[in-house]
């Protein structure tokens, strides 16, 4: 058996359909997409805006539902646009524009959009796993709204494909408390990181990995962002993360192919369950 750790190579800030092909072509098996909301808490655009990572164009933008339709095509086996390698999508939900009391509505509206335009109302929709990444612990009701909507619409089975992440670099203990409040018991990724324009140590990522490996924490997988340089990629792998978010997936793949890393890590495939803690 192959007992190497599966790695998700997460293409950062993929906000146009052309960029999906570009990043997967460079070696990503996963993408991160920014989602902006209108004043009524409807997901509106895949859009990051200024400022963004150094060396990247910040203004790529697609109507959210058009992005979902294109994403469905590239993750539906048999479609002419199908990309077999793309197995996971992180929606970086820009809920900072919303009031805290709109979080539930945002979750509801997000679920309805995904159900219709990505999952094709449960009829042979896209197959990728989805992570809802939320920047603010106070917005945990987004998860509740999302889950209750899929249940009410008769598609609870799709929750098998959905996980969550709180991306605000909060104390791990506070993240754990928030998940308790939200009634979340699994499918948890934990991110840690900072824009590539700045440096950040691995202290908190190591704390997240320790929680993951303790057997008593809530975290299943840990990813670190944004990792663009060869040495920082090696350091991140040495910390035993599960995912590396990058602007340069070809560099991540290059390091994964170095002898020292090739024996411990491999690129995740669709058969790898992203909600399962790796036991090595």
From Swiss-Prot:
The UniProt record gives the binding positions of Mg(2+) as: 32, 34, 92
InterPro entries, alphabetically?
PLC-like_Pdiesterase_TIM-brl
Q: Which reaction equation describes what this protein catalyses?
A: an N-(acyl)-sphingosylphosphocholine = an N-(acyl)-sphingosyl-1,3-cyclic phosphate + choline; an N-(acyl)-sphingosylphosphoethanolamine = an N-(acyl)-sphingosyl-1,3-cyclic phosphate + ethanolamine; a 1-acyl-sn-glycero-3-phosphocholine = a 1-acyl-sn-glycero-2,3-cyclic phosphate + choline; a 1-acyl-sn-glycero-3-phosphoethanolamine = a 1-acyl-sn-glycero-2,3-cyclic phosphate + ethanolamine
Report the record's disulfide bonds. Answer: 52-58, 54-197
Q: Where in the cell is it found?
A: Secreted
Q: Which chain positions lie within coiled-coil regions?
A: none
What's the protein called, per UniProt? Dermonecrotic toxin LgSicTox-alphaIC1
